Structures are given as C-alpha cells and as structure tokens.
Swiss-Prot record:
This is Homeobox protein Hox-B4a. Sequence-specific transcription factor which is part of a developmental regulatory system that provides cells with specific positional identities on the anterior-posterior axis. It comes from Takifugu rubripes. Pfam families: Homeodomain. InterPro entries: Antp_homeobox_Deformed_sf, HD, HD_metazoa, Homeobox_antennapedia, Homeobox_Antennapedia_CS, Homeobox_CS, Homeodomain-like_sf.
Length: 288
C-alpha cells in the first residue's frame, strides 16, 4: 500500500541521500562460482565467522542499534531498512549523490579529543585531576584570628613583633565567668576552654595571668613575685618596729634556750635594785 501511494504521487521530489549502490542487497555479498563454496566445504579447518553465529534475520535486525539522527532526517517514511542498518532506496528510482548531505552528517558526529602533548604524561594528568577536583576547606568567620596590628606589604625590616590578639565579646564573657569561679586553671580545664572558644592554650594562659595581675592591682594586694627577704626588711624599716630581744629560758639541760621577746629590759632599774643574775627566777646555770 505504501509503495503504490509512493508511485502515484507525481509531485514527490527525489530523496537526497548518499550513494548506496555498493550497499544494495544484491551487491552486498559478492557473487562466487559454485566451485568456491565446494572448496570451502572441503576445508573444515578454515575459520568461518558466519558459522559461529546462527541468528534469524529478524533477530539480527532487532539487535542492531537504531539508525542515527542524520539518517532519520534525510530519508522519507517509505524508505526500507536493511538488516545491517543501511538505507535501501525504493525500486525504480535513481539516486544522485549530494555532497551537502554528507557534509551535514559529518558535522553531527562529535570530534575526537585532541591527543595529549609530548611533555605531559598520563601519570601527571591523573595526579593533577584529584587536586583540581578537591574542594577548598570552608573557613568560617569565627575561625579566623583577628589581630589589631597589621603589617603592611611594603615592610622590608626584620621580623615584626607578635601582634596582639583581639578577643571577641563572647570569648571575653566566657573567660570572665571562668575567672570569677577559678582564678587558677588546671591543664585539663584550660584545654576544654581552648577547644570551646577556639583559642590556643597559650592564649588562655596569658589571659589569666594578665587578669590576675589586674585583680591584684584593683584590690591593692602586694606583688607575690618579689623576694620574701627584701619584703621583710622593707616592712621593718617602714613601720619602725623594734628588733626582737632574746631572753634566756630555763631548760632541763645545762644548755640555755633563748626565746625572742619584744620587751626591752631597763638596765638602770636592774642596777638600782641590785638584782643579780643568780637571783633572777628565769636564769638557771645548772641542775638543782
């Protein structure tokens, strides 16, 4: 029915597709003499790829991939497909080769990738591809260290001094609350606070040292870092207290035991009364 309607239509223009004389069904397989097939039957050891696969023509047509978009756009509805996927024109029509159609088909096919350069090896390409696909780590604002002093890029001197760390309000609030309960931190507690506030242990230690010095200054407490000997001499000179007087105390043995006392004895009173060292009740030179 399709062939009759195709031949009746006189206004139909000849289809344009590439030459297919060599793909026709009659010329697809070469014509051989009967002796050629008889010679092949006599040689069973020869390799025959067609004998390995026995398929029906309809099954083979289903297994073949569908025709490409280029063939679909250039052929009419009445064109017959061969089992091999080639286009067969209807009988009675003369086909003319059209170079434009072939050029259009070539443009549809993708171009192969360019070959790698001589200096670049496949190993280097494989090593560079994971680095390019690796994502940069995400850095949040609270993870960045804020510094007050910023060294300019034109600075050519020696190594600049360590910049002062500016703590955020939240960090200062947490540190003040911890200092309110504990003025001295243990190592374990210092590590916990450092992880919580995203600071280093050294920063926590220095902050508590400075905070303790400020607290002592506000409460007017003496500095504990000064030597104890110099502190005692300075306090005696400034206050004007007398030096302690050593008085003997009787003991069980003959040796004398002295105890300090702040009372200074009056020599004139002892001389006038005529008291002797032997009459003094607290002095004993030997056993009784």
């Amino acid at each position: 029915m399709a062939m009759s309607s195709y031949l009746i239509n006189s206004n139909y223009v000849d289809p344009k597709f590439p030459p297919c004389e060599e793909y026709s069904q009659s010329d697809y397989l070469p014509n051989h003499s009967p002796d050629y097939y008889s010679s092949q039957r006599q040689e069973p050891a020869a390799f025959q790829p067609d004998s390995l696969y026995h398929h029906h023509p309809h099954q083979q047509q289903r297994a073949e991939p569908p025709y490409t978009q280029c063939q679909r756009a250039g052929q009419p509805a009445s064109v017959v497909m061969s089992p091999r996927g080639h286009v067969l024109p209807p009988s009675g029509l003369q086909t003319t080769p059209v170079p434009e159609q072939s050029h259009r088909c070539e443009s549809v096919t993708p171009s192969p990738p360019p070959p790698p350069s001589c200096g670049q090896t496949p190993h280097s390409q494989g090593a560079s591809s994971p680095a390019s696909t690796r994502k940069d780590p995400v850095v949040y604002p609270w993870m960045k260290k804020v510094h007050v002093n910023i060294v300019s890029s034109n600075y050519t001197g020696g190594e600049p001094k360590r910049s002062r760390t500016a703590y955020t309000r939240q960090q200062v609030l947490e540190l003040e609350k911890e200092f309110h309960y504990n003025r001295y931190l243990t190592r374990r507690r210092r590590v916990e606070i450092a992880h919580t506030l995203c600071l280093s242990e050294r920063q926590i230690k220095i902050w508590f040292q400075n905070r303790r010095m400020k607290w002592k200054k506000d409460h007017k407490l003496p500095n504990t870092k000064v030597r104890s000997g110099s502190t005692n001499t300075n306090s005696q000179v400034l206050t004007g207290f007398p030096k302690p007087h050593w008085t003997p105390i009787a003991g069980r043995d003959t040796c004398m035991i002295y105890a300090p006392s702040l009372a200074v004895p009056d020599c004139e009173t002892e001389c006038r009364s005529g008291s002797h060292a032997s009459d003094h009740p607290s002095l004993h030179f030997g056993p009784e």
